[in-house]
Amino acid sequence: MEPKTKKQRSLYIPYAGPVLLEFPLLNKGSAFSMEERRNFNLLGLLPEVVETIEEQAERAWIQYQGFKTEIDKHIYLRNIQDTNETLFYRLVNNHLDEMMPVIYTPTVGAACERFSEIYRRSRGVFISYQNRHNMDDILQNVPNHNIKVIVVTDGERILGLGDQGIGGMGIPIGKLSLYTACGGISPAYTLPVVLDVGTNNQQLLNDPLYMGWRNPRITDDEYYEFVDEFIQAVKQRWPDVLLQFEDFAQKNAMPLLNRYRNEICSFNDDIQGTAAVTVGTLIAASRAAGGQLSEKKIVFLGAGSAGCGIAEMIISQTQREGLSEEAARQKVFMVDRFGLLTDKMPNLLPFQTKLVQKRENLSDWDTDSDVLSLLDVVRNVKPDILIGVSGQTGLFTEEIIREMHKHCPRPIVMPLSNPTSRVEATPQDIIAWTEGNALVATGSPFNPVVWKDKIYPIAQCNNAFIFPGIGLGVIASGASRITDEMLMSASETLAQYSPLVLNGEGLVLPELKDIQKVSRAIAFAVGKMAQQQGVAVKTSAEALQQAIDDNFWQAEYRDYRRTSI
């Protein structure tokens, strides 16, 4: 007889009766068998019929369809998550196309704005500046001893919505839901955290329902000392955890990443995850057009930490394809609200300084303006790729897109700002303005575009294609750090799964139904690169794949056996 795998073995638990029914990680609801109902003091606490998880999921799907607004659907799904996590993930995986935009972007933005209004039940950890001296006690209050992934935010720059205070907790909750749904990381291993350092959002401060610390945000040394206390407490409690920074303001995001990426296994998804999925998309789009990314000229609208992170990763990729660093940098043009970044521009942020163009090289440009606008840049650079990370709607105007198309027969246009209300241009407009010739990928989900009786699928440049696989790869390999090369390997693997590259048609990114397969492949590539980089113990390829399989959690009920506490 073959020995049982870990997933086939019974789970021994000490909880029973109503306490067990109130434990989301263990609750099965109507799926508890009659034997389990007897053994765990559940007789009479549930209806008579014993259901399968699929029968439960079908009922939940019918109930879900009864809600008319996206925010009501979000609230309903969160209620299931807080009641029965296994059922929640079975339901979400059964309807991922429909539900991913509801549990994460764009609907999670509204959920963050209304967090205190729709609050039902606590999930995760809320660490207030007022409680900074109790940091160790707070983390010891977390009942899960084997936390492997933490997503933390301070709520200051939530999507394109700005300061949402503790309402930003919706982002770590949603992000970790995707780690599980897409990357197979057990929900028992995940922990959402919000650092409550106050808020400068006057609307929240005036809201009688607001549940956070009613105080202006702490800044400077006080802020960084508080974050450091948190990091040190995390290292003490879970020294091998993967820590993801999420939706920190531009002024803090890069400094925190640079400060801690070599101290704790950590990364910033807004900077590195967005960069990795964007580069993967661009590699695939370039190959589909029969070329390489290094042959393309690229213009960015938005030169914050996310935009500059993408630009630096593009430069690294084009160097891998054979360009010198100088040549690679000359092909990338960054535009912010003050115009094109040049070496003559004052008050540049540290991460912007290497991405400037030399003003002396622009003397022959067709413009009379000292401030070089996006239109000026597009007209003179004649780019192949236009990327929007501005967080401002409508900035890719018809004039700009038509000017780009005039010089590029197959432009790649990527309005990546989210939520949907912040997108630089809609796919419908971009397709129309380029006579159906643009390849479009967006940051938020959009339906296929119908233009002149032809259907154009719109790929969502969704970080969920990257970060779950990175997380799984880190856990499976035991990586102690996340290196740039590990991120590049994730991008390259994502590009290999592009239907447009594989089949010559379809989306430039894989379909959501394939996301678990893609996450497993990315996990293997990331784990292998971690071993090559010396941040994980070397094993055979077979052993790494086995570790990935062993760590991949499925939304299925296990048999329970009773044990004492």
UniProtKB/Swiss-Prot annotation:
UniProt cross-references to PROSITE patterns, sorted A to Z: MALIC_ENZYMES
UniProt keyword annotation of Ribosomal protein present: no
Matching CDD domains: NAD_bind_1_malic_enz (cd05312)
Positions with a binding annotation for a divalent metal cation: E246, D247, D270
Gene Ontology biological process: malate metabolic process
The keyword Secreted belongs to this UniProt entry's keyword annotation: no
Matches recorded under SUPFAM superfamilies: Aminoacid dehydrogenase-like, N-terminal domain, NAD(P)-binding Rossmann-fold domains
Annotated SMART domains: malic, Malic_M
Enzyme class (EC, first level): oxidoreductase
The protein's Enzyme Commission number: 1.1.1.38
GO cellular component: cytosol
Cofactor(s) listed in the protein's UniProt record: Mg(2+); Mn(2+)
Binding site for NAD(+): R157, D270, N418
Subunit structure: Homotetramer.
Family to which this protein belongs: Belongs to the malic enzymes family.
Name of the protein in its database record: NAD-dependent malic enzyme
Native species: Escherichia coli O139:H28 (strain E24377A / ETEC)
Organism ancestry: Bacteria, Pseudomonadati, Pseudomonadota, Gammaproteobacteria, Enterobacterales
